[in-house]
Amino acid sequence: MEKKTVYNITNSIAISEEEAVNCNIPEVNKAEINLSQLKRNFDIIQGFLKPNTKFMAVLKGDAYGHGIRPIAKELINLKCDVFGVVRLIEAFTLRKAGIKTPIMLLAPISPSQAAWVIRYNIIPMVDSEEIVEALDQSASQNDTIVKLHVKINTGLNRYGVNPENAVKFIREIHEKYLHVQVDGVYTHFQDPDYNPDFTHKQIECFNNIIFQLQKQKLRPRIIHAANSTGIIRYPEAHYDMVRCGTLLFGLEHEQGQRNMPKGIKTLMELKGRIMKVRTIRAGEAGGYGSTFVAKKDSKVAIIAFGYGDGISRGWKEVLVAGKRVPVVNYFMDGLMVDISNIDETVKELDEAVIVGNQGDESITWLEACKSLGSYVDEQIQCITERVPKKYFYEK
């Protein structure tokens, strides 16, 4: 596959993005992020939606480790309607990047943060009168009206107003506060992949609240419930808007229970340079702690991708010269792999693939995370800042 690199983002501690674009920094490893695949994923997901259903791209956790600013800018080109984040700092990052798209906070704020929500034109989630009051007071001081979304707790039991109090809570906001407006109501599923019976109970509970709001002429403009799994498996829960995170980035669950739609793929591949090739004699140890002792004369390679870059101990295999090779030792700045069974000449600065394709072989995120007992969306966010991100379109 031919690639056209559009820009690089290198360690922000050492160098700015602008500098990274204009100079060729020697790199020993990288995360390659395929923006063409992002568009394909976006288009495939849109195919599940009815016309006029709004699309919220959930970009929490630095866009699931993919880089919140470049991903958001690409999604603007794709006509994404709303961005969802969890921390105020994520919303500030987008606004500071010049992004005007509506941004919604999917977790509660503290009263002291109300002024910042208004200053940066962010849509807050509320589930307590204390927050509504703080928003109303701050909005009054700024002579504006804040549009907010009320979260309903239908079973996840993290945030949200309990169902028996939801209609009363929303009605009182309408009656008591002049500078806030309930623009949306939403809920979040507890276990849509593995427990459809409970998910349907959540939908039924949520529908009952919507019905009561309609009867009292309190139905807000935007109703939403479906997350990534909900988009695929619960079309009755699409309502006015869907929230999409892991599916947009092609991140499967540990057992692949989601049944990913055809064509949805991950965007990110991880690659590292071979920094040293050497022979270890039979009986000698390689790396810290003598965890690897050669049973015979063995050729090993040191790859510049260690747990300081976000690779967990327990990573089983990588690709060298298009073949799978076992990882035999881990350290902060690299991996030691046994390349004794590779016939081809392997030399220093050759590229190894940690996750992705090389030749006819591939290692997927799902495969790697199963061996670690981890989740893909958990592991991919472990990749650290010192790994340069290279964004590209397929030619």
Swiss-Prot record:
Primary enzyme class: isomerase
Catalysed reaction equations from the record: L-alanine = D-alanine
Necessary cofactors: pyridoxal 5'-phosphate
Pathway: Amino-acid biosynthesis; D-alanine biosynthesis; D-alanine from L-alanine: step 1/1
Annotated active site: 60, 288
Record: residues binding substrate: 158, 332
Organism domain of life: Bacteria
Molecular-function annotations in GO: alanine racemase activity; pyridoxal phosphate binding
Gene Ontology CC: one annotated term: cytosol
InterPro entries: Ala_racemase, Ala_racemase/Decarboxylase_C, Ala_racemase_C, Ala_racemase_N, Ala_racemase_pyridoxalP-BS, PLP-binding_barrel
Modified positions (N6-(pyridoxal phosphate)lysine) in chain numbering: 60
UniProt EC number: 5.1.1.1
PROSITE patterns: ALANINE_RACEMASE
Gene Ontology biological process: D-alanine biosynthetic process
Family to which the UniProt record says this protein belongs: Belongs to the alanine racemase family.
Protein name (Swiss-Prot/TrEMBL): Alanine racemase 2
Source organism (scientific name): Clostridium acetobutylicum (strain ATCC 824 / DSM 792 / JCM 1419 / IAM 19013 / LMG 5710 / NBRC 13948 / NRRL B-527 / VKM B-1787 / 2291 / W)
Lineage of the organism: Bacteria, Bacillati, Bacillota, Clostridia, Eubacteriales
Protein's gene: alr2
